């Protein structure tokens, strides 16, 4: 449980990511001290519900992230507090960072996300926008 301290807690993030990989988990998800979903160890988190992109607000304690900023400047994004028990409400989930770009998520804990269409579409649009810069 961290809130706004990722820059000071990089060793913790790396350690948690390694521990998660040992358990077959690609990216651990961190909750803040209020139990709200904040971010992944090295990623920002987004959800889709009824074709609306939803993200935890920065006040949840995550770092903004380059791809997160790109998405905010390109698409309408609704910010809301997200609790672990809210997972069943969402159609899709995806993670972002500057190395991965956009990575659709098919499962988080016991929750599965049946669709990855929007995440894949955003990934393709990001790829196309970067290709046009070359």
Could you tell me what each predicted segment is?
Residues 8, 27, 44-45:
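Acidic Asp/Glu-based divalent-cation binding sites
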Residues 9-12, 63:
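Short, well-structured alpha-helical patches and their helix-loop capping segments
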Residues 11-30:
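Short, basic/aromatic recognition patches
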Residues 37, 42-134:
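Conserved catalytic-core subdomain
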